[in-house]
Amino acid sequence: MRIGLFAVGRLKTGPEKDLAARYLDRFAKAGPAIGLELARMTEVAESRASNGETRKREEAVLLQKAHPDGGILILLDERGKALDSEAFAALLGTFRDQGKRDLTIAIGGADGLDPSLYDRADATICLGKMTWPHQLVRILIAEQLYRAVTILSGHPYHRV
């Protein structure tokens, strides 16, 4: 299953980008052995619209263009369901085992995600109830993708 990340906003060169890239590289190397591969990282500029609702709508259009037809859509949202690492790995494994070809994990902009996306989403999850800056969210989800691969493959990286 090909996994893509979609993010509103661009990571500037620096330690955050380096750390996210390190975990995505680990995921890209370990994932194919268990049927998971990194397909793409799509970054789009934040909308310049004058109000939040318009910005969210414009960003949702960009997400829909980047998301493969028939693919699984997971939204990251502070109001989403909190999963531990094992449950996140199980969710990815379930989608993979159902024969799903593409999965996109979406990180919204400062205004959040457009309400229309929630109806289309296959899952809405959170990385805790706190609000995180998008730079840190990318690091956290990149690490959790790598951790999910290690859980699904029985690698000792994940210890409880």
Curated annotation (Swiss-Prot):
SUPFAM superfamilies: alpha/beta knot (SSF75217). The keyword Cytoplasm applies. It is found in: Cytoplasm. It comes from the Bacteria. One of its GO terms (molecular function) is rRNA (pseudouridine-N3-)-methyltransferase activity. Gene3D superfamilies: 3.40.1280.10. Coiled coil: none annotated. S-adenosyl-L-methionine binds at L76, G108, L127, G128, K129, M130, T131, W132. InterPro entries: Alpha/beta_knot_MTases (IPR029028), RlmH-like (IPR003742), tRNA_m1G_MTases_N (IPR029026). It catalyses: pseudouridine(1915) in 23S rRNA + S-adenosyl-L-methionine = N(3)-methylpseudouridine(1915) in 23S rRNA + S-adenosyl-L-homocysteine + H(+). Keywords: Cytoplasm, Methyltransferase, rRNA processing, S-adenosyl-L-methionine, Transferase. One of its GO terms (cellular component) is cytoplasm. Its EC number is 2.1.1.177. Its main location: cytoplasm. HAMAP family: 23SrRNA_methyltr_H (MF_00658). PANTHER family: METHYLTRANSFERASE, RIBOSOMAL RNA LARGE SUBUNIT METHYLTRANSFERASE H. Homodimer. Specifically methylates the pseudouridine at position 1915 (m3Psi1915) in 23S rRNA. NCBIfam families: PRK00103.2-3. Belongs to the RNA methyltransferase RlmH family. This is Ribosomal RNA large subunit methyltransferase H.
